[in-house]
């Protein structure tokens, strides 16, 4: 479980371990509706975009990035309206964005049925 396709963490043998347009559920699905992935984790892709604390910017090692050299652009800056990263895709989209390597950006003022969040804790 783990390859270079970018999809290995949620697409099981039947390809439908994520809630997206071709995943067999016509709208947001209940928590745990789909089988867990190979790591035993549920609902890691699809259903709703999930807000991340990281602000959106070029990847840290991208040429021309203000964070070139490896500094991760985490958390808000003095401008709280800067776009933040969202990940995971949402139920009405295709599987192209339902992969761990894809990230999206949205303004924190935006709120609708396609956006959610996941509570996490550092161990």
Label each PLM-derived region with a short phrase.
Residues 4-5, 9, 13-29, 44-123:
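Surface-exposed recognition segments
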Residues 34-37:
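Short, small/polar residue-rich loop motifs at catalytic or cofactor-binding pockets
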């Amino acid at each position: 479980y783990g390859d270079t396709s970018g999809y290995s963490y949620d697409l099981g043998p039947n390809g439908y371990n994520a809630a997206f347009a071709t995943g067999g559920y016509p709208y947001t699905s209940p928590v745990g509706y789909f089988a867990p992935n190979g790591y035993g984790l549920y609902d890691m892709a699809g259903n709703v975009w999930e807000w991340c604390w990281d602000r959106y910017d070029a990847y840290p090692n991208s040429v021309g990035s203000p964070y070139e050299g490896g500094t991760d652009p985490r958390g808000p800056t003095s401008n709280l309206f800067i776009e933040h990263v969202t990940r995971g895709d949402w139920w009405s989209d295709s599987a192209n964005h339902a992969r761990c390597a894809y990230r999206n950006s949205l303004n924190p003022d935006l709120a609708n049925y396609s956006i959610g969040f996941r509570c996490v804790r550092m161990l």
